[in-house]
Amino acid sequence: MNKKDQFHSLKENPKNIRFEEFCNILNSFGFIHKGGKGSHRVFTKEGIPEIMTIQNCEGKAKPYQIRQFCKLVEQYHLLE
């Protein structure tokens, strides 16, 4: 699945996304895992001042964090 397909899939249904799948999608968009504590992981991307902090909730990603990621993709035109 390419980046556009991944993005549209996330945007259409931000629920029931596995945490590890979301981490892989962040990596495919150029975000780098910078650490975190406990169930949280911190991702950053050069040129984007916002930091993505995501958390593992029983193996799933939080829907509001997926929506935040989608807003960043649109705001910084990461699909282009």
Task: Enumerate the language-model features and the residues they cover.
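Terminus-proximal functional modules
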Residues: 1, 11-14, 51
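Polyanion-binding surface elements
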Residues: 11-30
